[in-house]
Each structure stands twice: as C-alpha cells, then as structure tokens.
C-alpha cells in the first residue's frame, strides 16, 4: 500500500462481501473463465466470494510479497502460475501503486485482472474494479483490524 497514505478507509466484512458480489456481477458477462487466480494474501477472500458467485471450482494462487505493515519493498514471487493466463481471472483486493499488478500481469498477460478497490496509480493495470479510492488513502481491510475499546471523546481531550 502507498507509503504516504494519510487517510484511512475502514472496510467491514459486510461491505467487503457486498463489493465482492458486485465484482462478480460485473464479471458475469465478461467470462467464461477457466479458473480464478487469487493474488495472496489480499485476494484470497474476494476470490472465494467471486468463485462462489460465478460457480467456479478451479481456484489457484499467485503468491507475492511486496510489503508488510511498515514498509514497501521489491516484489518477490513466492509461488507463480504456469502459462500466459489465457482464460484465467486474477482477483486481488486492491491495486495501489501497481507494483504487484505489474508483476502478476508480466507473468499472466492474457488473464483478466479484477480488484475490488483501485487507486489512480494502479488503475490502468486492472481490467475491472468496483471502487476507486485516492492514492493517499490507506484501506483498512477487516482481516487487518480488530475491535477494541475507544475512550469517550471527552476523555481524549487530555
């Protein structure tokens, strides 16, 4: 995700599920696809929802490590996919700077690439997406956050 993100955009499980179903609706008339490739780890949950909605049983992963919770590094392929991507649907949660998408596209150039969220820098690299967010926004996915007690506003003034 963008190193310079200044805003946060929290996404609930319900919102993610709704947006993944919306993505499936958009993809329904684009296929048929022979299989889904989830870009790990962020693409796993959206790919499962899209696979269910499109009644697809063949799901694989393209495993890439590009960042952790503190920094962005050079992308490393941990597990790739054979072939040029013909007939495949690539699913990821987000395209941000395009580093991961560019790497995956270079290995599967004929696949259809879909994400739930897209930022301006990476948007040209995906074929289908649901929601555009600004480049300076950090998306808080439900698998990255947990609920905790928040102090009342009056107590936070100190």
Question: Which ranges hold each PLM region?
Answer:
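PRPP-associated nucleotide enzymes
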Residues: 1-158
């Amino acid at each position: 995700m963008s190193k310079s993100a200044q805003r946060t955009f929290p996404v609930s499980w319900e919102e993610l599920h709704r947006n993944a179903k919306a993505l499936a609706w958009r993809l329904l008339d684009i296929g048929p696809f022979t299989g889904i490739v989830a870009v790990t780890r962020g693409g796993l949950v959206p790919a499962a929802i899209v696979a269910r909605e499109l009644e697809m049983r063949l799901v694989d992963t393209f495993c890439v490590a590009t960042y952790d919770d503190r920094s962005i590094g050079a992308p490393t392929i941990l597990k790739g996919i054979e072939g040029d991507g013909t007939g495949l649907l690539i699913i990821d949660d987000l395209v941000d700077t395009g580093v991961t998408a560019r790497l995956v596209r270079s290995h599967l150039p004929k696949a259809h690439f879909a994400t739930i969220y897209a930022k301006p820098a990476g948007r040209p690299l995906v074929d289908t997406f649901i929601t555009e967010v600004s480049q300076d926004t950090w998306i808080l996915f439900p698998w990255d956050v947990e609920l905790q007690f928040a102090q009342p506003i009056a107590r936070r003034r100190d």
